């Protein structure tokens, strides 16, 4: 049995190198060009490796053609102009995706597919998520070099000049949280909730099949040179159940897997591949993986913290973190760091629709589950001690003894957020803040004061009637009314979030700077997101709610020693069920009203009704648990 190859690095993307590698590895039998559409979906196809080798020069130069109407490029590639090209990216890592259920006859190794991250091109323009992030990265680097030339005193404070710069490196990192469970089995909500409150699972030892798969995944990440850093149990889940033969029969655990940072575009590519690898490994062992933001109502959801960094590489080989101050014990951040942080916070209204773009994502972003809903940051109580505030949107990660580790942590994304667009929009927002604060010429103390401004105070860059910094737990320290006043009222539905593009046109220009995003791309994203929102709301969420409500049946009768409390609770349940799902000749229920509003294109009304539905569904779930627990 020969040795498997897991990646092909950019330095080996020459035609002769690729041919040699493929001929030496007959287990690699297919090639797939992975373009990523505006919805964050990776394309996958199976091109026989013999055909790829035969036509390699043309395929690498011109790509392959496909029907763009089958991917999410609404408003760009439609039925009348559907042709798109998928063009290989020659400057990134290519992965070999192995099928461990199908083995090559020649050498006994698993059959592999060479996955080549690619760009989607329509009418000569790159229109995919990968291309947007690539443009954002180049725009950030080019604009920062221009600022270095414009403000020589800035680079002087770091100990270099713009002529000394070899490269501006944007580094990012993500992680994945997931629920792993036995298929077709579910755990009792109260059991899960109690285990979470008691922290019975957090960082506990994994056992059985879950341990085996987790260790296999970490080993495989090493093989792919993805530099895994940690895997552990998260707060959700319950203890495994074992049958009389010692076999685990019921699994319901929440896990987290972390790996090392990389260049921004490579970071997003890595995440897609790692997510697929994790799914394959658990499914191969008979377990289901849930990456949804909120797989189970009422217990911990899955977040995906996105880390954002920037550094310069000098021609002498030295690396300097641009967000770290020259004296870590005298200041929290550098001028560039303050500007970048304020840029995200000020422009988050147009970043948020990209970060939180699904009904599922909004199910997670609620008070009480360590999920951020307020546009606010925390610097820490003092320069020497880092902030540990987990209630904020943007965390500042810093270590006084390690300036290179300074970065920002955006805490709102989830595993199904489009990481390419999240990174692109975040770096565009950061660039706006950097440009504005450098132009204002603020001192370090003035920058800290600007970020720490109080509600009603005029800001040089930040808005007057907002606050942006809190060292308190914003959920414990403030009421909902106070949070809405200080940090702005958070959107509660996909439609409310998307509406921010229209109400914040000046901030939308921040995304378009350098033609990173265009009107065409933003409109395509909006159209795609609205379609998914309304189709899921009408076709899945309402249907699932109806199925759930039908399980809420009367349990008491006179023979069961029913009390007046049972009668009252049941009457409340019937009232809510009727309000939600039962029409009469003269009155429509909430579910019907939502469907009618969606069909009529009245999305404002549908969004308001969705909020009512969510509130009443939460109320009736809790009420039925109380009612059921009081029955003999």
Residue ranges with predicted function:
Residues 1-228, 262-276, 421-422, 427, ...:
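ATP/Mg2+-dependent ligation/transfer catalytic cores
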Residues 104-106, 243-247, 396:
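Short beta-strand/turn micro-motifs at beta-sheet edges
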Residues 145, 149, 219-226, 283-287, ...:
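Generic secondary-structure signature for well-ordered alpha-helical cores
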